[in-house]
Amino acid sequence: MARYTDASCRLCRREGEKLFLKGERCYTDKCSVARRPYAPGQHGQGRKKMSEYGIQLREKAKVRRFYGVLEGQFSKYFEVASRRKGITGENLLQILETRLDNVVYRLGLGTSRPESRQLVTHGHFTVNGKRVNIPSYLIKVGDVIAVADNSKNSPKVKSIREIAGGKVIPKWLEFDEENLVGKVVALPAREDIDLPIKEHLIVELYSK
């Protein structure tokens, strides 16, 4: 399976803002963006002004990196979003938010999206009682996401609960912290997505 191989902190510095790829570290003074707020590389501090097209490309790259989605899959998501009723950019974000790995992260069961993706791949979660190990699996309203019974006592899950416990859960999700069970009660609205994304730039890019 294709995946990003570049260092997470370099990706954040390249985009010029935190992508929250390193979990707890992103909230401390160890964050690379806070310490070196410029692009990586020899000429990182002398970044030139970008064209309109370049700005649109960077916004798409930023969103892909937020959610850990590669180019081909992102293009497919956009095609689906453009066919749905409503605003294409908001439809796109809604699709990305309802990926299983992102829902796991939003429930506080992973300290970052990359970690949540890894936990899903390792089979630590069930959807409606069936084990699902596909991070891109799209969750629907009414779906129940739970930590698999044989994973509840694993050291990894226990440590995550200690770090992520008390996380604010989006209003489109419900979470039973005692039993480690979450439920999708609605599709996320634009105001529920707290990421610094300008989705209209992506729509403009694909419209060319």
UniProtKB/Swiss-Prot annotation:
PROSITE patterns found in the cross-reference section: RIBOSOMAL_S4 (PS00632), S4 (PS50889)
UniProtKB keywords: Ribonucleoprotein, Ribosomal protein, RNA-binding, rRNA-binding
GO cellular component: small ribosomal subunit
Superkingdom classification of source: Bacteria
Residue ranges occupied by any S4 RNA-binding domain in the UniProt entry: 98-164
Classification via InterPro entries: Ribosomal_uS4, Ribosomal_uS4_bac-type, Ribosomal_uS4_CS, Ribosomal_uS4_N, S4_RNA-bd, S4_RNA-bd_sf
Any one Gene Ontology molecular-function term assigned to this protein's record: rRNA binding
Entry's family note: Belongs to the universal ribosomal protein uS4 family.
NCBIfam families assigned to the protein according to its UniProt record, in alphabetical order: PRK05327.1, rpsD_bact
Function field: One of the primary rRNA binding proteins, it binds directly to 16S rRNA where it nucleates assembly of the body of the 30S subunit.
Stated name of the protein: Small ribosomal subunit protein uS4
Organism of this sequence: Ruminiclostridium cellulolyticum (strain ATCC 35319 / DSM 5812 / JCM 6584 / H10) (Clostridium cellulolyticum)
